[in-house]
Amino acid sequence: INSICLLPSDGGVCRGRFTNYYYNSRTRRCETFRYGGCGGNANNFHTLRQCQATCYSS
């Protein structure tokens, strides 16, 4: 699995209200989380498809 996908969800430091996706390594699924718009880490995807393409093994 890509090491990015092992990072915890991180909403960042800004106060926006964006619904993005992250890979939850406990459930082994891409799930939604609230992203503030800046900061955070690389386990942060705009779409479910991007998350799945990066984190699901083929």
From Swiss-Prot:
Q: Cellular component terms, GO, for this chain's entry? A: extracellular space; nematocyst
The BPTI/Kunitz inhibitor domain extends over 5-55
The protein's UniProt keywords, in alphabetical order, are: Disulfide bond, Nematocyst, Protease inhibitor, Secreted, Serine protease inhibitor
The chain's disulfide connectivity reads 5-55, 14-38, 30-51
In this chain, the site described as Reactive bond is at 15-16
Q: What InterPro entries has UniProt attached to this entry?
A: Kunitz_BPTI, Kunitz_BPTI_sf, Prtase_inh_Kunz-CS, TFPI/VKTCI-like
Q: GO MF terms on file?
A: serine-type endopeptidase inhibitor activity
Can you say where in the cell this protein is located? Secreted; Nematocyst
Q: Using the UniProt record, give the first listed, main subcellular location.
A: secreted
**One Pfam family recorded for the sequence:** Kunitz_BPTI
Q: SUPFAM superfamilies in the record, alphabetically? A: BPTI-like (SSF57362)
Indicate the family of this protein. Answer: Belongs to the venom Kunitz-type family. Sea anemone type 2 potassium channel toxin subfamily.
* Task of the protein: Serine protease inhibitor. Shows activity on trypsin and also shows a weak inhibition against alpha-chymotrypsin.
Q: What is this protein called?
A: PI-actitoxin-Axm2b
Identify the species of origin.
Answer: Anthopleura aff. xanthogrammica (Sea anemone)
